[in-house]
Amino acid sequence: MLFDAFTQKRSRKITEEGGRTMQAVVLFEDGRWTNFKPLTWTRPVCLLRTGIFPLWEKVARACQAAGWQDFEVHIHTRRYLAPTLRHCLTGIRDKGRGTGRWKGVFVNELERLEGKSALFVNGRLLVTPELAPQASALEEGTAYLKGNELLAIALGERATAKVLPALQKGEPLTDADLQTLLDAASRRVEVTDALLLRYPWQLIDHNAELISAEFALATAGKESEGKLEQGAVIYGGDASRVYLGKGAIVHPTVVLDVTHGPIYIGDGSIVYPPTRIEGPAYIGKGTWIVGGKIREGSNIGDVCRVGGEVEESILHGYSNKYHDGFLGHAYVGEWVNLGALTTNSDLKDTYGSVRVTVEGEGKVDAGTKVGCFIGDHVKTSIGTLIYTGKRIGIFSHLHGVATDDVPSFTIWAKSIGGQGDAVELLLDSALEIHRRVLARRKIEATPEEAELIRTLFELTREERSKAGVRQGRPQL
């Protein structure tokens, strides 16, 4: 198990009876972030989700469970993401203060670590509830590795000061940077059973079991405050397996099936008939389920609009799948709109292994049940079909059938008319569509977001060039 190796006592433990705790936890990003594209074009790996909590929060909660108090959470990521990420995390930062959990969440503000002890954690590390309490046995001056990959390293004030220059460049850590961290440790421990995520489909593979495992953590000290209307049914278990947040409403004839796992429905969410939700399932705040078949392992973020059939899929906030269609074993980013009857495949006709293209590795076997990976701000037209294992780049528009990976900022219509077409989405169009979409949710687009979109447009030019995407107007 991940923290089993932390029980050796050759150096001082971080948490002891009457002792001190670390003053900060730092989630660092390494070069493997590219494996998770297009999802990580717009966020660090540690903000990806599986189960109820994102990866960074699983780490922070593990530290809390170990008895840490009044500590800071730091996210280290690419420089171009920092301004927008700080803005998005403002609510988390304010919420964190004074709660007895952590003092705040800070992005690339590593100067705050001067004079502090810190636990540096690889942002790809998956910490489960079973392992979290064992974090109390972490030892200062120790680096924890799996093979040749760094999982975590606990450093005192002086050692932390020595490694800060490696992180203050605002770029993912290189092998040389990681070696700088390792050199600051007085000893190393091999951890064989840790799970350091390498591919995006692993998030989906572990999602259902983590929703079940984290349900108790997410509902600890809380009672359901929502309304289960007369005629709504909890099937396969009792009400303790369902959590309804404040203002949540489940309408008559809706079925909540908890036979195989719990169901969490966040504050202000509404479930309309005819809907059947099978646990384990997580639905965030302010989301509407509008006549859907929400199958086991569904993980739907805040302020989404979801109908049709969803199975074993993860959706970030503000994404819409309002109409009929199927979404299976898929990972969907923020502000995505899937048009009516959009359907993805998650199983080959041959029942063979799905091969996903990973940057720097080529085709990688991902298992037999693999859907698609859809980046932020993607739009699909009515009747769009997406083949197994396809990656749909950020800000792209899909028409027809996607049998290949789709580059970012692309109007993709290769299956429509004649030889089809793939045309670059104009930057000005992307900015204006972004403004309109946010306005529909009564959110004002920020200058930081506009600058991020401009940067991403330039960073993804090579994707479009390699795929033969042309400039001009689409020929539909």
What are these regions (language model features)?
Residues 32-35, 47-49, 291-292, 303-474:
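Glycine-rich hexapeptide-repeat left-handed beta-helix
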Residues 38-41, 185, 189, 269, ...:
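Generic, low-specificity signal for short hydrophobic/alpha-helical stretches with a mild N-terminal bias
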